[in-house]
Amino acid sequence: MLGPTFVEGETDTAIPALVSEASGVILELGPGIGNQLPRYNGSRITKVFGVEPNEALHRSLRRKIKACGLTDVYEIVPCGIENVVELEKHGIVFNSMDTILSIQVLCSVPNLEETLRRLYALMKPGGQLVMYEHVKSTDILSAIVQSMCWFPH
């Protein structure tokens, strides 16, 4: 889910509007190389924690953070959401997040139910979970390929 072609494909979806609604202290789950960073509304952000376990993506993510002018507010957290000890080192604790942002990430977590419980626990009362997940393709060839694979939709 990397690169400009993927980002262009998101343009005509709800993703840009959803990301722009993220506010306050934000936990971005699986930011990858930072595809969503240009979509943030900087005036609504206090702090962003990008929880990204794939350290091979961190260099590109840092470049994108800098290019988007978010270096003062964006912190890469080099672990998965299940690593409570590492999250706590960064100040990510229960009832601490205003927004949790998850764009096309939850399909790849090892234990979805546990992950959702953990995310909910991290949100402040009245916080928001901003989420967009993959849907079954309307393209006939892609739909055929998807139907041959396990595809929760």
Regions found by a protein language model. Name each.
Residues 23, 45, 94-98:
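Local beta-strand N-terminus motif with an aromatic residue
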Residues 82-100:
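A short acidic, Gly/Pro-enriched loop at the edge of an enzyme's catalytic core
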Residues 19-20, 94, 116:
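A short, aliphatic-rich alpha-helical micro-motif
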Residues 2-25, 33-39:
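Conserved alpha-helix/loop element of class I SAM-dependent methyltransferases that forms part
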Residues 97-112:
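A short SAM/SAH-binding and catalytic strip from SAM-dependent methyltransferases
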Residues 113-128:
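A short glycine-rich, Lys/Arg-flanked "PGG" loop and its adjoining helix->strand segment in the class I
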Residues 128-152:
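Conserved class I S-adenosyl-L-methionine
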Residues 25-86:
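Class I SAM-dependent methyltransferase SAM/SAH-binding core
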